């Protein structure tokens, strides 16, 4: 496994739409493993492949309930509304309140190619939406309702 360089805001790759994964092979598995290692090293809760310069629909997330690896994730259902703080490993030091669904259902492939669905609520719903937005070339700052100052940031981790 290897630590990947996290692309920062201003890098054009962050604004490009990622392409679907058509074959799950050892290269894709290595990318997922590298992404997870990179996310953990940087104390994040999620990372999309384009954040490490790879335009493929790959996401890793860990909101404290174990690592999720999602290949070709898509939101198939959303419900409710929540407004909460977000940050991003690609936009260090910037945080803001973003409106997201309270609950989402996401369909994806696992590393064996099996179709799976996961229902996420609260922080997991927020992380899923944030990372899937990345795959569309959308950053959380595009959706910020209000930027947060240092006094309001206690306990906020970068997604």
Curated annotation (Swiss-Prot):
Cofactor note: Binds 1 Fe(2+) ion.
SUPFAM superfamilies named in the record: Peptide deformylase
Any one biological process term the GO annotation gives: co-translational protein modification
EC top class, as a word: hydrolase
Keywords: Hydrolase, Iron, Metal-binding, Protein biosynthesis
Active-site residues, record numbering mapped to chain: 131
Cysteines joined through disulfide linkages: none
Catalytic activity: N-terminal N-formyl-L-methionyl-[peptide] + H2O = N-terminal L-methionyl-[peptide] + formate
Pfam families: Pep_deformylase (PF01327)
Superkingdom assignment: Bacteria
The keyword Protein biosynthesis belongs to this UniProt entry's keyword annotation: yes
Entry EC no(s): 3.5.1.88
Cofactor(s) listed: Fe(2+)
Any one Gene Ontology molecular-function term assigned to this protein's record: metal ion binding
Record-listed Fe cation binding positions: 88, 130, 134
Entry function: Removes the formyl group from the N-terminal Met of newly synthesized proteins. Requires at least a dipeptide for an efficient rate of reaction. N-terminal L-methionine is a prerequisite for activity but the enzyme has broad specificity at other positions.
Entries under HAMAP family matching the protein: Pep_deformylase (MF_00163)
Entry's family note: Belongs to the polypeptide deformylase family.
Name of the featured protein: Peptide deformylase
């Amino acid at each position: 496994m290897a630590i990947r360089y996290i692309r920062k805001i201003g890098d054009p790759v962050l604004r490009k739409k990622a392409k679907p994964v058509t074959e799950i092979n050892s290269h894709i598995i290595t990318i997922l493993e590298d992404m997870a290692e990179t996310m953990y090293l940087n104390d994040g809760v999620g990372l999309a492949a384009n954040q490490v310069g790879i335009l493929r629909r790959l996401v890793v997330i860990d909101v404290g309930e174990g690592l999720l690896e999602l290949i070709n994730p898509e939101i198939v259902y959303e419900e409710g509304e929540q407004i909460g703080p977000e940050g991003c490993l690609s936009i260090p030091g910037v945080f803001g309140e973003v409106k997201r669904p309270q609950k989402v259902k996401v369909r994806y492939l696992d590393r064996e190619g099996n179709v799976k669905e996961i229902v996420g609520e609260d922080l997991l719903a927020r992380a899923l939406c944030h990372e899937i937005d990345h795959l569309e070339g959308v950053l959380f700052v595009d959706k910020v309702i209000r930027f947060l100052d240092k006094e309001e940031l206690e306990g906020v981790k970068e997604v």
